[in-house]
Design a protein with these regions (language model features):
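Amphipathic alpha-helical packing segments from all-alpha helical-bundle domains
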Residues: 79-82, 128-154, 158-172, 190-198
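Amphipathic alpha-helical segments used for helix-helix packing
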Residues: 109-130, 147, 173-176
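Helix-turn-helix
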Residues: 26, 34-68, 72
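Short, hydrophobic secondary-structure boundary micro-motifs
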Residues: 44, 117-121, 132, 158, ...
Length: 202
């Protein structure tokens, strides 16, 4: 399944015009730049609106809260990473090492901008039911990243789907643990490799 465009609205909402899509991209770029510089607290909706050159009311029509906005930023980051890995896929013949390699590369991409990673993960942690559709899209993008790394033809088996869910949870937990200083980079890598080995189970 190809990833959705970062400018695409959530499923069930009307398609954006070209002008609306460009406005949404500007908003996401502005939020990303603020998060890179100062993390979650630096992303203030008024500053995002000013940087994106949109009215504050317009910003809230696109993203009802900062949490909605930063979850959308995370989706955009995952989609960009997905495209990069599709162009440069892992080369191992077995699925478990391919998945471990993919998630390790994803972790390193987030590691390069720790304040942005902190902002996105905090937004996911704060998300309530009103952000459910956006969180589901992030989860689907993460799951698709893992499924693509498995690299098989045809739909995944039920055991593979179960393994992907556990691997996805491990990935998120490892990222939170690293951001909070409870896990080292080496421990994150080890956890990702351990979780990926679930794919070898019958």
């Amino acid at each position: 399944m190809p990833p959705l465009s970062p400018s695409a609205p959530p499923p069930g909402e009307p398609q954006l015009t070209a002008r609306q899509a460009e406005r949404r991209r500007r908003i996401l770029r502005a939020a990303t730049a603020l998060a890179v510089r100062g993390g979650y607290e630096a992303v203030q909706m008024r500053e995002v609106a000013e940087s994106a050159q949109v009215a504050l009311g317009t910003l809230y029509r696109y993203f009802p809260s900062k949490v909605h906005l930063l979850v959308a930023v995370m989706l955009e980051q995952l989609q960009g990473l997905h495209e990069h890995i599709r162009r440069h896929p892992p080369t191992d013949r077995e699925p478990a090492p391919r998945v471990a390699d993919t998630l390790t590369r994803a972790f390193h991409a987030l590691q390069r901008e720790p304040l942005l990673a902190e902002a996105m993960v905090r937004a996911l942690s704060f998300a309530d039911r009103s952000v459910g559709a956006e969180v589901d899209r992030v989860s689907a993008a993460t799951g698709q990243l893992i499924l693509d790394a498995i690299g098989q033809c045809g739909p995944p088996t039920e055991s593979q789907r179960a393994a992907v869910r556990v691997i996805e949870h491990t990935w998120h937990s490892a990222l939170v643990s690293w951001l909070s200083g409870r896990s080292s980079i080496a421990e994150v890598r080890a956890d990702l490799h351990t979780a990926a080995r679930l794919l070898t189970l019958p």
